[in-house]
C-alpha cells in the first residue's frame, strides 16, 4: 500500500513514494517519539518501516530507490553515496538500529547489517562519500547508551528529563518512556528516582539526579582519523 500524502491538502497522493520519502519520514517519527514519548509515533515509525521493507528491500542487502511495483522503469537502482542530502539507505540503516533498540526486534538489526554488507566495498574505497553510513556504523559499533524514563508524578517530567539528556553529545543514546515500547517495559520508578541509564548490558540504579546521568554520558568513544 502507499503511505504518501500531500500537505496541506491532507489527501493521499497519486505519486509513488521513493525510498527517500520513507526513510526521512521514519527518521522524523522516531525522533518525534523520543522527544514527546507519544507511543503513536513509535508505532507509526514501525508500520512505515514494515511498508518500506515490503516495497523497497533487496534480499541481497539494502533498499532500491523505487518500489517493487514501479513497472515503468527499465531497471531499479540502489544508491549508497551521500549527495546534497544524506543517502536514504544510510538513513535507513540508522533507523533500523534505533528501532532495534526500542522494539527489541532482531529483524531490524539484520536489515541494517544487510545495508552495511551491500555498501562495504564502496565505503572502504570512498569513505568521504559515506558520512551518514559511517554515522550509522558508529552507532552499531559503539556500546549503546539506553535511557529509560519511568513515568513520574509530573506529566511533563519525562520530556524535561529527555531535553536535559540531549545537552550531552551521545550519538549512541536512545531514549524511551511510557507503555507500548519494549525498551521501556519493566522499568517502574525506584525508591531513589525515575531515570535508568544503561550502557551495553550494565545499568545504573534508578536516580532522579540528572547531573549524575549527564556526567555518565560524557563517557563517549572518540575516534581519530589517521593523517
Please give the residue ranges for each predicted region.
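Short, well-ordered junction/capping motifs at the entry into regular secondary structure
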Residues: 1-2
Amino acid at each position: 500500500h502507499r503511505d504518501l500524502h500531500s500537505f496541506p491538502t491532507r489527501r493521499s497522493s497519486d505519486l509513488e513514494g521513493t525510498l527517500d520519502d520513507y526513510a526521512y519520514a521514519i527518521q522524523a517519527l522516531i525522533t518525534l517519539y523520543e522527544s514527546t514519548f507519544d507511543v503513536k509515533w513509535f508505532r507509526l515509525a514501525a508500520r512505515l518501516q514494515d511498508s518500506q521493507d515490503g516495497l523497497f528491500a533487496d534480499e541481497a542487502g539494502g533498499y532500491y530507490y523505487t518500489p517493487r511495483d514501479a513497472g515503468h522503469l527499465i531497471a531499479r537502482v540502489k544508491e549508497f553515496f551521500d549527495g546534497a542530502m544524506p543517502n536514504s539507505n544510510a538513513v535507513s540503516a540508522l533507523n533500523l538500529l534505533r528501532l532495534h533498540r526500542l522494539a527489541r526486534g532482531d529483524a531490524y538489526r539484520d536489515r541494517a547489517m544487510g545495508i552495511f554488507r551491500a555498501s562495504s566495498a564502496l565505503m572502504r574505497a570512498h569513505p568521504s562519500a559515506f558520512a551518514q553510513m559511517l554515522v550509522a556504523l558508529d552507532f552499531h559499533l559503539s556500546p549503546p547508551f539506553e535511557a529509560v524514563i519511568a513515568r513520574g508524578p509530573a506529566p511533563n517530567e519525562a520530556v524535561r528529563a529527555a531535553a536535559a539528556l540531549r545537552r550531552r553529545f551521545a550519538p549512541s543514546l536512545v531514549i524511551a518512556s511510557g507503555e507500548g515500547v519494549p525498551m521501556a517495559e519493566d522499568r517502574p520508578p525506584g525508591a531513589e528516582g525515575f531515570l535508568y541509564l544503561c550502557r551495553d548490558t550494565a545499568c545504573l540504579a534508578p536516580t532522579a539526579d540528572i547531573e549524575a546521568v549527564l556526567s555518565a554520558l560524557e563517557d563517549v568513544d572518540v575516534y581519530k582519523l589517521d593523517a
